[in-house]
Amino acid sequence: RSDRRRFYWACPDCHGRFEAAPGLKLFSMLPDDKTLLEEVRAADISAMAKHFGRVVCPHCGSMPEHRHKTHMNKGGIWVPDGVRFTETGEMVGTPMKSSIRGYWLGGVAAAYQSWESIVEQHLLGLRDYALTGSEEKLKQTTNTDQGMPYMPRHLVEAKGSGQTPRDRVEKDLRRFIVPPDTRCVLVSVDVQGGQ
């Protein structure tokens, strides 16, 4: 319902505009979680966070230092959904029409959150998941530090496998038949608007 504005920085090197996106997308040196799950079990998390906690400009590949974040935030602009930047820095597109302004700021642009700490918290969450199977730390850091909604690991893995719910159906179950001791059958459907 809102116009869904997102915060854009200008690269200190090439001056190209890019979204200070929620999540870990700008930490493009960071390996994928599948690779990290093995590494974080015994690795020095602080050293890994220091190494991978660098934002990478998607235009020129430069890695501005964290000390530039305040300057980048001061020069940042809010861009509504439907608008993008050309290579010359011109805003083009049609902004979404709404009487409600909405803003989504990723943790990467948060004033009191260092890039290194965002990566470190993610790595600690992955370590906890790898050692205990608990997703609580991952969920917390994703929601609060990264500014992203958390998706449970089994859904991420199912999405990555390319399987649909229909592909995972158990073939030996008969349709419209319930076990003999069943006392009640409840059915619910969650319908998202427009989907």
PLM regions with names:
Residues 3, 46-49, 130, 134, ...:
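Generic alpha-helical structural element
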Residues 2-106:
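Cys/His-rich short segments
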